[in-house]
């Protein structure tokens, strides 16, 4: 009944737990339930937000769960579009927190192409408004950085004194990264908001809050 009359369903849900078994159970159960409800309601387009490189980071339980979600969607027989996004600017400080040991942040110097959440939502909406792709589209930010360099810039912008060091063995979502694990391919749709502009707008918003 909740989906009665809906033409499109957009799934941007996330697991409350990142423990391997729990996150897999969440994405498999929620996706199966959504797809079944959509079939009953006659929904014409299932759109799911996923992660660029999830299929390249197989040591990560979270990424394996996202791949499992994608496989369920692809095999469902329902019209679908999967939007794989790079990491959001907004999560940079959380990434730093999880990679912190004392006063030092350990991150690998691999390519990183983050984007603003506003650009993510715009891209997802455009896909939802169009016909089902029955495939995957990648989206990313307009700039590439070294992963460690980007987080160093973020902490500097907010006068965070933690030191960021390049560590090739530092893990991200439980896995070591290759040079291009986190960046989209050449056909990716790119956002418009540059990092410096996002920082400026974020500081203005914080002052106004």
Each predicted region: which residue ranges?
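NAD(P)H-binding glycine-rich loop region in Rossmannoid oxidoreductase-like domains
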Residues: 1-41, 52-58
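Generic alpha-helical secondary-structure signal
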Residues: 2-5, 123, 153, 201
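Active-site beta-alpha turn of Rossmann-fold NAD(P)-dependent dehydrogenases/reductases
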Residues: 13, 47-50, 84-86
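Pocket-edge positions in alpha/beta enzyme catalytic cores
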Residues: 19-23, 112, 142, 187-190
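Soluble or luminal CAZymes and related metallo-dependent hydrolases
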Residues: 26, 30, 65, 190
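Short, amphipathic alpha-helical "lid/cap" segments that border enzyme active or binding sites
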Residues: 35, 117-125, 192-200
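Oxidoreductase cofactor-interface core, primarily capturing Rossmann-like NAD(P)-dependent enzymes
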Residues: 41-44, 55-163, 167-169, 173-178
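A hydrophobic C-terminal alpha-helical subdomain
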Residues: 155-209
């Amino acid at each position: 009944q909740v989906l009665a009359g809906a033409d499109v369903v957009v799934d941007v849900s996330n697991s409350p737990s990142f423990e391997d078994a729990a996150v897999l159970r969440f994405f498999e159960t929620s996706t199966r339930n959504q797809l079944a409800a959509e079939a009953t309601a006659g929904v014409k387009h299932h759109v799911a937000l996923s992660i660029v490189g999830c299929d390249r980071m197989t040591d990560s339980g979270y990424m394996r769960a996202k791949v499992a979600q994608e496989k369920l969607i692809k095999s469902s027989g329902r019209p679908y579009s999967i939007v794989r996004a790079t990491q959001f600017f907004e999560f940079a400080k959380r990434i730093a927190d999880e990679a912190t040991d004392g006063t030092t942040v350990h991150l690998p110097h691999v390519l990183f192409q983050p984007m603003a959440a506003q650009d993510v939502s715009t891209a997802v909406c455009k896909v939802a408004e169009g016909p089902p792709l029955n495939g995957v589209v990648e989206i990313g930010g307009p700039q590439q950085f070294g992963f460690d360099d980007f987080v160093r810039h973020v902490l500097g912008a907010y006068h965070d004194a933690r030191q960021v060091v390049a560590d090739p063995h530092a893990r991200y979502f439980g896995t070591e990264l290759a040079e291009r694990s986190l960046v989209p391919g050449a056909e990716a749709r790119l956002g418009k908001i540059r990092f410096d502009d996002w920082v400026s707008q974020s500081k203005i918003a914080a002052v106004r809050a």
